[in-house]
């Protein structure tokens, strides 16, 4: 939650999957897609499309929508990101933009596209967030080695 603006709100603890569609359709809300979870959980639940209503701001309008696209690619589902003050963007499960229109230039904006509704299994879907942890570990090893080289160079210079 974003203090102090959302301090009185309570975060959810379950996924929202719409029934009646030919494939599972998830509903995330705005900031949800900025994090690995619940985006990963929707992928593991087999979601083929995630609807992502948002209220993007002028500062983050492009960035925020593109994070949602990345989450769709990571987890194998199409994304419909509908922002009040940003972009209406629809992508397939591989991140290809199927349609995009600005929603902050007129009183009303609409976008109509055909979306392939099929979940694609991904490595991230199956194994989770191991890569960021591995990258962090490799960075730590590199920093330690660099510190050792600097220390050695400093002692040899004396």
Question: Where in the sequence are the language-model features?
Answer:
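Enzyme catalytic cores with a strong preference for nitrogen-chemistry domains
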Residues: 1-158
């Amino acid at each position: 939650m974003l203090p102090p603006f959302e301090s009185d709100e309570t975060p959810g603890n379950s996924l929202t999957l719409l029934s009646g569609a030919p494939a599972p359709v998830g509903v995330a809300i705005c900031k949800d897609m900025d994090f690995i979870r619940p985006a990963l959980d929707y992928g593991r639940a087999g979601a083929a499309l995630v609807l992502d209503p948002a209220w993007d701001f002028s500062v983050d309008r492009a960035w925020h929508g593109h994070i949602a696209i990345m989450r769709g690619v990571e987890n194998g589902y199409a994304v419909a990101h509908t922002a009040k003050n940003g972009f209406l963007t629809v992508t397939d499960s591989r991140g290809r933009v199927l349609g995009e229109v600005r929603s902050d230039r007129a009183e009303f904006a609409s976008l109509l596209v055909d979306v392939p509704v099929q979940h694609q299994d991904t490595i991230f879907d199956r194994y989770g967030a191991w890569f960021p942890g591995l990258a962090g570990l490799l960075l730590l090893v590199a920093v330690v080695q660099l510190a050792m080289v600097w220390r050695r160079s400093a002692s040899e210079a004396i």
